[in-house]
């Protein structure tokens, strides 16, 4: 198992500086992580920095609340891809999901999938705000809409990934869809626990610490 290729090396805090982004990019190249996940404003910088590596550029859409309209999320997606994004992590319409307005949830994800072309789409369900039934429904709708992954968390709500949520999401989507655990992996042991529960990708700001077997503090 190449643990480095499970990791989306992540820096999403709003106060992030260019110097901090450049540090993350350098680390991603050094450790050959799966991707770097940055806010849209840093996508062009990341794409330029990573162009001669196989580290992908991941960004976030409708982040962190998920409460924009489908048209806005689709525009954000197209803009991010035009700037060099390879992977799109979009926040599901959490309020619509909890209301039971599944048509809107589906339309919302489909708009991003359509705008993404052949790029990878991961749907953040924000599991910490959902009941287990809502988590299952969010995963099912993401799958129906043609997304490539479901993802546990933004890292900016009341909680991050749990092993139980990852296991439930994997059970729901089966073997052919990706599951990303984010906002909960701070150590090598955390990462392995998520992978054993069914995670195929891990979003963490602690990628270097995970690879070095150390404990990291902080989230995104």
Curated annotation (Swiss-Prot):
Signal peptide: none annotated. SMART domains: DeoC. Pfam families: DeoC (PF01791). One of its GO terms (molecular function) is deoxyribose-phosphate aldolase activity. It is an enzyme of class 4 (lyase). Pathway: Carbohydrate degradation; 2-deoxy-D-ribose 1-phosphate degradation; D-glyceraldehyde 3-phosphate and acetaldehyde from 2-deoxy-alpha-D-ribose 1-phosphate: step 2/2. It catalyses: 2-deoxy-D-ribose 5-phosphate = D-glyceraldehyde 3-phosphate + acetaldehyde. The keyword Lyase applies. Its EC number is 4.1.2.4. It comes from the Bacteria. The active site is at residues 89, 151, 180. SUPFAM superfamilies: Aldolase. Keywords: Cytoplasm, Lyase, Schiff base. PANTHER family: DEOXYRIBOSE-PHOSPHATE ALDOLASE (PTHR10889:SF1). Belongs to the DeoC/FbaB aldolase family. DeoC type 1 subfamily. Catalyzes a reversible aldol reaction between acetaldehyde and D-glyceraldehyde 3-phosphate to generate 2-deoxy-D-ribose 5-phosphate. This is Deoxyribose-phosphate aldolase.
